[in-house]
Amino acid sequence: MKDQGRSTRKRTGGRLKHASNKKRHQLGREPAETTVGETRVQYIDSRGNEKKVRALSTNVAQVADGDAVSEAEIENVVDNPSNVNYARRNIITKGAIIETSAGRARVSSRPGQTGQVNAVLID
C-alpha cells in the first residue's frame, strides 16, 4: 500500500509517534507507466463516485496540428523529460516526445489519468 501521509521517521532518523491511523484518502497507487503497444486500460474508483481510466498501453494518439485533430499511430517514444529511462522503456507521460505516423508530437494529456494520449505536432 502506498501511503501519501506524513513520513514515519524524523529528519534525524528517529521514529515518529502518529496521532491517528492511516486513512483511505491518504492512499496512493503505483504509477500506470503507459507503454506503446496493444490498447489496454484499467478502470479505478476515484473520489466522488467517479471512475478513472488508466491507459496501461496504447498505440494510438489524437494529434493536433493547428485546428485539425487526427488519429495517428504511435511508433515509439523519442524523448521523455520526466525520466531518462522512460524513453528507452517506451513509457508515455505528459511532456514526452513521441514518433507518430503524422510526425513527431509532444504529449499534452496524462495517459495514466485520462486513458488516452493527446499530442501536438512539433515539426
Curated annotation (Swiss-Prot):
Protein name in the entry: Small ribosomal subunit protein eS8
Family: Belongs to the eukaryotic ribosomal protein eS8 family.
Gene that produces this protein: rps8e
Key words, A-Z: Ribonucleoprotein, Ribosomal protein
Pfam families associated with the record: Ribosomal_S8e
Record has NAD as a keyword: no
Quaternary structure note: Part of the 30S ribosomal subunit.
GO MF annotation list: structural constituent of ribosome
NCBIfam families: eS8
Disordered: annotated span: 1-37
A Gene Ontology biological process term: translation
HAMAP family, A to Z: Ribosomal_eS8
Any one cellular-component term (Gene Ontology): ribonucleoprotein complex
